[in-house]
A protein has these predicted regions:
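Short, structured beta-strand/loop micro-motifs enriched in basic residues and often containing a Trp
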Residues: 1-12, 78-84
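Long, compositionally biased, intrinsically disordered segments
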Residues: 1-3, 7, 18-27, 36-65, ...
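Short nucleic-acid-contacting surface segments enriched for D/E, G, S/T with interspersed K/R
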Residues: 13-28, 88-103
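Short, Lys/Arg- and Gly-enriched loop/turn segments at beta-strand edges
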Residues: 32-45, 107-117
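Structural detector for short beta-strands of small beta-barrel domains
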Residues: 44-71, 97-105, 120-175
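Eukaryotic intrinsically disordered, low-complexity regulatory regions
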Residues: 65, 74-100, 176
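Short aromatic-glycine-enriched beta-strand elements
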Residues: 68-76, 180-185
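Long terminal accessory segments
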Residues: 172-204
Length: 204
């Protein structure tokens, strides 16, 4: 299984994840943040993610959780891949519904991995991958607002909001500024041991 997911820079400052490097074995869970409406669908089950981490899916809703999250959280399954969506509209669906939408695939920001012990009978959302490629995306200046004591910017951009000149391939995230930038992480399950890889989230 191959995926590309967004790693937002604030994870480093908050101590959620360590800087990653190419070749590293990681154990991760994932979130999809929808960019459109979630709808019931009769489409065949699928999950496709592009190299900018933008994805489309038609996936089966497994459980729905209303605690400990502030918004309803639904676990979705498409073939061998499971992920969560945290969205108010999850309350409109029932377990077993097939739901389709588009969105961005991201590293779990902590709501699943950190509070795993609080979910009733949680399904396994963790996957062991090898990091195959790391791309740093520096936010174009029009998305960055600089003040005397602070810098404001979004945590990530869609693929159509930046250009090839904003992307830099890295062997390691060590030593980066983790400022107005985010990272596209290419992951692959092939050739990586599925045993003895601890969860990459530092608080787990």
């Amino acid at each position: 299984m191959r995926l590309t997911a967004v790693f937002e820079s604030w994870h480093i400052g908050d101590g959620n994840y360590p800087p990653l490097k190419v070749g590293q074995a990681v154990n991760l869970s994932f979130q999809v943040e929808p960019v459109g409406k979630l709808d019931k669908t009769d489409q065949a089950v699928m999950f496709d993610v592009a190299d900018d981490a933008e994805c489309v899916f038609a996936s089966e809703l497994i459980p729905i959780y209303r605690r400990p999250t502030e918004r309803p959280l639904g676990i979705f399954q498409a073939g061998e891949f499971r992920f969560y969506v945290e969205d108010e509209s999850i309350a409109n669906f029932a377990v077993g519904d097939r739901v389709g939408s588009a969105g961005t695939l991201l590293f779990d920001y902590y709501i699943w991995v950190e509070f795993l012990h609080e979910y009733a009978e949680p399904p396994n959302l963790f996957y062991t991958f090898q990091v195959k490629r790391i791309r740093k995306v520096t936010l174009p200046t029009e998305f960055v607002t600089r003040h005397v004591r602070a810098v404001g910017h979004p945590t990530r951009l869609r693929g159509d909001q930046y250009a090839a000149c904003d992307i830099q391939d890295l062997e390691s995230m060590e030593g980066q500024n983790f400022g107005p930038e985010f990272y596209l992480i290419d992951l692959d399950t092939e050739g990586v041991s599925k045993t003895n890889v601890r969860k990459t989230f530092l608080g787990s």
